[in-house]
């Protein structure tokens, strides 16, 4: 226990010698119960009287030491929220981060904050993420580490631009670049302030005075330096490739910027491509009188005009079939004959079968342009999952298609512009038509006119959409800047071998995503972001970038911010020596490029700005599962590319927040829960009560965050009930420590009651498990351990046993002080155990501890500190053997008051009897430690059957197996419990049935009153 008091003296429990005054110091190393274990949830004993349970105290009320504390049992309405604000102020929440940074400690813990997007109000997803991080940080800080946690915000990009333009009701073309940037910056700054205020209110400890922002000039400059380092190594290049393209946003998108609509409806068609030149090996199967067509299926008819080839699977089996309805001959995969015939509502007769490799050398005529040749080509991406086993290939509109085109030098012309419209190159019938709308209609009609469409139907499938505009995207070839992932991938995967993933399956997910990613497009055609520092020749397809130009721009950006790219003339963006070589001020042949860096590159280089040392790795990255393909991956790739190491040692991945029934939260469903409403309550407190931040934090810690996390009124109400029970436990502890000073009143462990020593043993084991769970970031297990301990071990078990000793013994009696010594240690361990999760409650308790005279902050007093001498496995078994007998007794009198019965325990001579003698030296006692455990009027311990038995008594039997010295000695002992109604009267002071007459005090109470 270390509440900021001076070190404990020799009388304190933690430094006292082991042993006990009640018997030999050595206990059996292992005791066991055959067929029976102690029930942690003690049976409720109806009518179990205590002096506290009646409003009528009688004439002895003032002699009973009832709990005294100002710690409230409940905080009603806004009291919880108001108390938390008061605690934050009083206990210095805002100064805690700087205080711990100034400590002279050797270890440091760095949690690198993944930047939330600065485009809206704080939501429960933010709460889940930030509170998980805070729990981890507070634990490591209390354990003695100097925590490094700098919050950040992702401030650039399309989502903010989209929101700004939407609020203004204009499109990007009607505003200048600087107008958009200024409004976007203001929007982001406002969102940051809202979010920051909420995070502070949730109790998040962080370096709030030195947050990082991706629009900060110094951050932008460091990002550009990483970009150029990668460019210099040949890892960044410009190329014409197909990328995900958003017509609504008029920019390229990364895969992480896509959302998939599972209910998207596409128009699919079966199209035939007339065989122009048969493959050499199949010439004998075809003749001019029976023309053959290759049959393909596509869900994107608009790409047919851009077709350059048809791909097949070389190792698959194919066939020439004859359609029974039309008599036409078609080539398709053998495995697809039946499903395609069914789809076309016809039958096929197989004319010939052959291997896919036999298709080599064949060509088809384009179904819209007969004189255009589409060769048959082998490809590895062809599957038999859907379609015909033959794939229409448009290199400008597919990643795999592009790969095939690169191998075979096919044209890659793109017929679609930035707005998703057909260009004039597509022909007058298609020009200026939206490819995903009327453009598709026209293409299908054109194919029908040439009689090359066999069937058209709608298909519902998952389709990618722009994550902000929610509209469908397409794949479109354009000149973009890319990161060469192929050259980094092996090193990135190797670096992950030194990284711990929580849960472990997240590693496989991340490596799978890396394997599936062919390249990373890092350029965007927008203005709110960091410019790619490249100058393009005005008339040639050339660009200018070198160390001189980049370093010059980096210095300008560091001093003035990235606005300079749009505000300064090109002549000032180039260093003088380069400017002279590029035509001079009056005849400059280059203009600044119009592309900005992808926001994933923006945030993915945060390690270069935030981690204090360029070689430093963060101890923990903790984000949602969507970041496995987002920030985790971009951070890994940029760090490995420039430093040859992963930026993190541990990666923890959590799920998303959902409504109470597992449904996605949305305004239309009316199930969006605002964290501020959770904390402060809604307009109607009867429907939306104020819970406070700690209940929000408890819900998060308790949830299985590695899957989807549900939230709603019932789970919040359950969390409130949990904390209410915890408050009652804490109130009991605080109330019974009044008048106790650990420095002067603690009882040495060897002199403590057995049950009190047993509780020290339990809390040492509890503390070890709690610490291990925090180390593993298994906060759900922490909560489960806490709930089991304070509800079962404390409230239901220990407190029910020791109330009489606390309330009715003399204030300074060693027996009472023994219990208070245990209570003080329990309180110390318990509060520290939940402090990282419930910081406000921990500080509130700290303010009410009677022997802490100048409370400041529990977080400044360290982690749990237990003593090795508390660990006594033999003692644990001794108590549990007595508890097994106690459970037998209580189970025999359901619904009745245990104090109205006497217990006779009969045990044959042996080890079990000797153990019970340690708890009760005399034959019969109403004040022994054994009787305290039994909660009976009195307990009698015998080695043989009593000479006389009472009619109507209850007899119970059981057997124990006792293991000594690690199992070297094994002894089985049987016992008998006889339950007899007591003939004694209830004492008017302690209410135990131990008095001779109804108006007389029991001997113990008479002695206590007499001493006073």
UniProtKB/Swiss-Prot annotation:
Instruction: Enumerate the catalysed reactions.
Output: tRNA(Ile) + L-isoleucine + ATP = L-isoleucyl-tRNA(Ile) + AMP + diphosphate
The listed locations are: Mitochondrion matrix
An individual GO BP term? isoleucyl-tRNA aminoacylation
**Domain of life, per the record?**
Eukaryota
Matches recorded under InterPro entries: aa-tRNA-synth_I_CS, aa-tRNA-synth_Ia, Anticodon_Ile_BEm, Ile-tRNA-ligase, Ile-tRNA-ligase_type1, Ile-tRNA_ligase, M/V/L/I-tRNA-synth_anticd-bd, Rossmann-like_a/b/a_fold
Annotated Gene Ontology cellular components are: mitochondrial matrix; mitochondrion
Residue span of the annotated presequence: 1-48
* Motif position, 'HIGH' region: 116-126
A Pfam family: zf-FPG_IleRS
Q: Which residues take part in binding ATP?
A: 664, 667
Q: What SUPFAM superfamilies would the database entry show?
A: Anticodon-binding domain of a subclass of class I aminoacyl-tRNA synthetases, Nucleotidylyl transferase, ValRS/IleRS/LeuRS editing domain
Annotated positions of the N6-succinyllysine modification: 56, 74, 194, 241, 479, 500, 775, 781
**Catalytic activity, EC:** 6.1.1.5
Q: What is its main location?
A: mitochondrion
Motif range ('KMSKS' region)? 664-668
Which keywords are on file for this protein?
Acetylation, Aminoacyl-tRNA synthetase, ATP-binding, Ligase, Mitochondrion, Nucleotide-binding, Protein biosynthesis, Transit peptide
- The enzyme class is ligase
Residue numbers of N6-acetyllysine PTMs = 74, 233, 241, 725, 775, 781
**Single GO molecular-function term?**
aminoacyl-tRNA deacylase activity
Q: What does this protein do?
A: Aminoacyl-tRNA synthetase that catalyzes the specific attachment of isoleucine to its cognate tRNA (tRNA(Ile)).
Record-linked PANTHER family: ISOLEUCINE--TRNA LIGASE, MITOCHONDRIAL (PTHR42765:SF1), SOLEUCYL-TRNA SYNTHETASE (PTHR42765)
Q: Which family does it belong to?
A: Belongs to the class-I aminoacyl-tRNA synthetase family.
Descriptive protein name = Isoleucine--tRNA ligase, mitochondrial
Source organism of the structure: Mus musculus (Mouse)
Kindly list the organism's lineage: Eukaryota, Metazoa, Chordata, Craniata, Vertebrata
């Amino acid at each position: 226990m270390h509440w900021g008091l001076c070190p404990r003296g020799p009388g304190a429990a933690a430094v006292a010698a082991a042993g006990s005054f009640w018997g030999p110091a050595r206990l059996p190393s292992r005791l066991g119960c055959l067929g029976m274990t102690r029930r942690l949830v003690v049976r409720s004993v109806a009518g179990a009287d205590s002096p506290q349970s009646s409003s009528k105290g009688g004439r002895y009320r003032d002699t009973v030491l009832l709990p005294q504390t100002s710690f409230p049992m409940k905080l009603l309405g806004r009291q919880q929220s108001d108390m938390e604000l008061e605690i934050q102020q009083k206990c210095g929440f805002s100064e805690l981060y700087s205080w711990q940074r100034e400590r002279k400690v050797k270890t440091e813990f760095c949690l690198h904050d993944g930047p939330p997007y600065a485009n809206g109000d704080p939501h429960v997803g933010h709460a889940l993420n930030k509170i998980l991080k805070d729990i981890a940080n507070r634990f490591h800080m209390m354990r003695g580490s100097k925590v490094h946690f700098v919050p950040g915000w992702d401030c650039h990009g399309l989502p903010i631009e989209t929101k700004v333009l939407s609020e203004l009701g204009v499109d990007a073309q009607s505003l200048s670049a600087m107008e958009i940037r200024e409004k976007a910056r203001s929007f982001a700054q406002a969102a940051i302030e809202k979010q920051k205020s909420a995070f502070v209110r949730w109790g998040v400890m962080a370096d709030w005075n030195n947050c990082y922002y991706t629009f900060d000039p110094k951050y932008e400059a460091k990002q550009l330096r990483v970009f150029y380092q990668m460019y210099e190594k040949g890892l960044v290049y410009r190329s014409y490739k197909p990328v995900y393209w958003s017509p609504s946003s008029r920019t390229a998108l990364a895969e992480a910027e896509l959302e998939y609509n599972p209910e998207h409806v596409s128009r699919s068609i079966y199209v035939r491509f007339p065989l122009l030149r048969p493959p050499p090996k199949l010439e004998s199967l075809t003749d001019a009188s029976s023309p053959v067509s290759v049959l393909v299926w596509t869900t994107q008819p608009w790409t047919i005009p851009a077709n350059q080839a048809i791909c097949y699977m070389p190792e698959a089996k194919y066939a020439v079939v004859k359609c029974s309805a039309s008599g036409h001959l078609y080539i398709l995969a053998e495995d697809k004959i039946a499903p395609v015939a069914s789809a076309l509502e016809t039958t096929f007769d197989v004319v010939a079968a052959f291997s896919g490799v036999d298709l080599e050398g064949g060509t088809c005529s384009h179904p819209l342009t007969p004189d255009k040749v589409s060769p048959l080509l082998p490809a590895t991406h062809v599957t038999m999952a859907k379609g015909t086993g033959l794939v229409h290939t448009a290199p400008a509109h597919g990643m795999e298609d592009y790969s095939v085109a690169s191998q075979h030098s096919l044209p890659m012309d793109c017929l679609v512009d930035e707005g998703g419209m057909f260009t004039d190159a597509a022909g007058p019938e298609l020009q200026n038509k939206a490819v995903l709308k009327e453009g598709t209609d026209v293409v299908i009609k054109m194919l029908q006119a040439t009689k090359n469409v066999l069937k058209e139907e709608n298909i519902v499938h998952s389709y990618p959409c722009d994550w902000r505009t929610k509209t469908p995207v397409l794949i479109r070839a354009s000149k973009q800047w890319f990161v060469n992932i192929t050259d980094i991938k092996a090193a990135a995967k190797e670096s992950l071998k030194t990284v711990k993933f929580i849960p472990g399956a997240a590693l496989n997910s991340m490596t799978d995503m890396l394997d599936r990613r062919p390249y990373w497009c890092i350029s965007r055609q927008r203005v709110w972001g960091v410019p790619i520092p490249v100058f393009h020749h005005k008339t040639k397809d050339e660009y200018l970038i070198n160390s001189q130009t980049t370093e010059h721009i980096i210095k300008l950006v560091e001093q003035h911010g990235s606005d300079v790219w749009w505000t300064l003339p090109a002549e000032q963006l180039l260093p003088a020596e380069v400017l002279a070589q590029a035509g001079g001020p009056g005849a400059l042949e280059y203009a600044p490029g119009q592309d900005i860096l992808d926001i994933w590159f923006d945030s993915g280089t945060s390690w270069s700005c935030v981690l204090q040392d360029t070689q430093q790795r963060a101890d923990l990255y903790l984000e949602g599962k969507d970041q496995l393909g987002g920030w985790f991956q971009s951070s890994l790739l940029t760090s490995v590319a420039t430093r040859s190491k992963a930026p993190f040692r541990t990666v923890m991945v959590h799920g998303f927040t959902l409504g109470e029934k597992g449904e996605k939260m949305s305004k239309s469903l009316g199930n969006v829960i605002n964290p501020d409403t959770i904390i402060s309550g809604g307009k109607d407190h009867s429907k939306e009560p104020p819970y406070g931040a700690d209940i929000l934090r408890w819900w998060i810690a308790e949830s299985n965050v590695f899957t989807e996390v549900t939230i709603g009124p019932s789970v919040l109400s359950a969390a409130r009930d949990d904390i209410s029970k915890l408050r009652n436990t804490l109130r009991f502890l605080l109330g019974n420590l009044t008048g106790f000073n650990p420095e002067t009143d603690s009882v040495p462990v060897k002199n403590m009651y057995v049950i009190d020593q047993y509780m020290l043993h339990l809390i040492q084991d509890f503390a070890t498990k709690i610490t291990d769970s925090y180390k593993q970031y298994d906060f759900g297990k922490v909560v489960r351990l806490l709930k089991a301990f304070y509800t079962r071990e404390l409230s239901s078990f220990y407190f029910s046993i020791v109330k009489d000793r606390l309330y009715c013994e003399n204030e300074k009696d060693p027996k009472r002080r023994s219990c208070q010594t245990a209570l003080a240690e329990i309180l110390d361990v318990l509060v520290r155990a939940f402090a990282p999760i419930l910081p406000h409650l921990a500080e509130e308790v700290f303010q009410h501890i009677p022997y802490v005279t100048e409370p400041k902050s529990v977080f400044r007093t360290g982690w749990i500190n237990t003593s090795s001498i508390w660990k006594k496995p033999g003692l644990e078994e001794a108590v549990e053997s007595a508890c097994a007998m106690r459970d037998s007794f209580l189970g025999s009198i359901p619904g009745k008051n245990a104090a109205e019965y006497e217990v006779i325990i009969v045990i044959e001579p042996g080890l079990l009897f000797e153990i019970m003698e340690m708890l009760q030296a005399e034959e019969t006692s109403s004040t022994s430690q054994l009787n305290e455990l039994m909660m009976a009027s009195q307990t009698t311990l015998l080695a043989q059957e009593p000479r006389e038995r009472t009619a109507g008594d209850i007899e119970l039997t059981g057997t124990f197996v006792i293991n000594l010295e690690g199992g070297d000695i094994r002894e089985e002992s049987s016992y008998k419990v006889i339950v007899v109604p007591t003939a004694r009267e209830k004492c008017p002071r302690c209410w135990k049935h131990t008095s001779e007459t109804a108006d007389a005090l029991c001997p113990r109470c008479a002695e206590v009153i007499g001493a006073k």
